[in-house]
Amino acid sequence: MAKLDVALAKVEGHHKEALLWFKRFRGQRVTWAEIKEHAEFGARLVNQAKGIYKPAYTDFALSVRTIQDGPYPDKEVEFRANGSWVCQYYQENIDPNQRDKEATNRGLMRCMEEQIPIGFLIKRKPKPGVEYEVLGLGFVKAWEDGYFTIEGINLNGETTDGIDAARARASQPLLSDPDDIFDAKDVNDLRQKQIATVAV
């Protein structure tokens, strides 16, 4: 089980400052202007030209962001009832065989190897007045066929590995939106609750 406080102790300076920003603003919406303003007075959070941001001062990637109608086949984020989430995020470069050609991808691989968290943003409002939802911090858990599996931390600041992760996925109903509320009158909600109860 990966613990966030242990992982954050591995980084320092602007890198740590930026990751703490993602932790602090988890669950909030921020404007693109606010993100750019933070870079003027503190650590840079994203790369304006790319979805993956790997600062020049480190071998690790710092953040990823998704946008509607982007050039890569990123998959929808799946939210869990315990506050965690998972996303299949596509690498930079459409050819999986060219993964290591891009510094951004190498940065995400280093994060996976050393279990350094990354920040995650989802674009929720297009121009004008672009807004992003801050999902907070997650860990790169795997790479396969061009997709990085990124697991978001739960409300206790932890994420799970291996068999535990599979068990957690089986026992936690996936929510299409983090604001979804259980409805006892909804047959699908009841079915998900029954499945989760049996799995536990």
What does each model-identified segment do?
Residues 146-153:
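Short, solvent-exposed secondary-structure boundary/capping segments
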